[in-house]
Structures are given as C-alpha cells and as structure tokens.
C-alpha cells in the first residue's frame, strides 16, 4: 500500500514546488525541446506523439493535459500553452474540444520564466520511464508559480486544492516575507484571482485559507 500511495502522491496527483504535476512538466518540457517557445504553432497531435517519449499514459490523457494548460480553454489564470482551434471552454456549456489532429499549439511567452535557466545546472535531471532520455525533476521557475494557477489533485491519504492568485501580488508577498517573516500575508495577497472573476462574500475566510492545509 505505501509504495502505491507514495507513487500517486509524488508521481501523479500532487503538484510540486514548481506548480506542476508530472504530466504538465513532461508536456511542457517536450514542447520546449521542440523549439516551441518561438515561431508558430504546430499540430497538437505532433506534440502529443513526442510527449509519449516521456509520458506513457496514452495520447488521450496527454491531450487532455494540453487542453487544460491552453489559453483557449480558459482554465488557468496564466496559461502555459498558446492554442489555435477549438480547445473548448472550461466552466461553460461548450466544454467539448476538437481532436488533436485539428488543433495547433505552442508555448506561451510566460514559459520563458519556466525554462530560462534550465541549461545552467539549476535543476536535476532523471531518466524517463524506459531509461532512454533525461527529463527535469523540476522546472527552474523564476516566480512562485504554484500559487499563480489553480491546481487540484486527489492522491492517496491527501488532496491538493490551490486557488490562483495575481502574479504581482504573489511576488510582492514573497519579497515581503523574505525581508520580514512576520509580514501579514493578507496585507499584500488580498484574495484569490480566478479566471472567471468572483465576489468575496465572507472576507474573514480568505485569511483562513492562506494558512489552511487539507487532508483526507
């Protein structure tokens, strides 16, 4: 039981300190290696096929991951994938997306902050599932990305549910805490910032969420 539980926690369901689950990281790193930080978009099916060298869980799950990370799907406050074609719309009646052979994608400009120092020995590299390639254990992000995009995950014995926050407020709060560990977080990190907007009904609950961890 314990090996299975740890595998799910560390290798599948819970985001790491770089804000990414393994499936996200494998996709984005593959796109980076394909040179998709610059230039135009390419067929999503091409990207999915290449990603299977790092992620053996099948093309459907890889494409689902790409859709969720895309600007067109409108799931993330700061999308990592620029999309072309029908990627569906999260939180709407039109959630269905076109097949990967009909859509195109590339990395969004914010991914420069994910990969800028990756070739400077800033992170460890590990073997992929069949020991034929190397992949980064983490990405050398330059901002607290784990707090900037909404992330949910259900593992074994624990769960993760992190709201998205404004990147400027997150960075200001991080700097303030580095200078003064007694800094009041709610002074600079006002409230979550959701893609679809929202209203704060009970403001005292906001400060509570800053300190609360959830276990199942």
Can you say where each PLM-predicted feature lies in the sequence?
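Catalytic phosphate-handling regions of large nucleic-acid enzymes and associated NTPases
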Residues: 1-205
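Conserved small/polar residues in nucleotide/adenosyl-binding loops
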Residues: 209-216
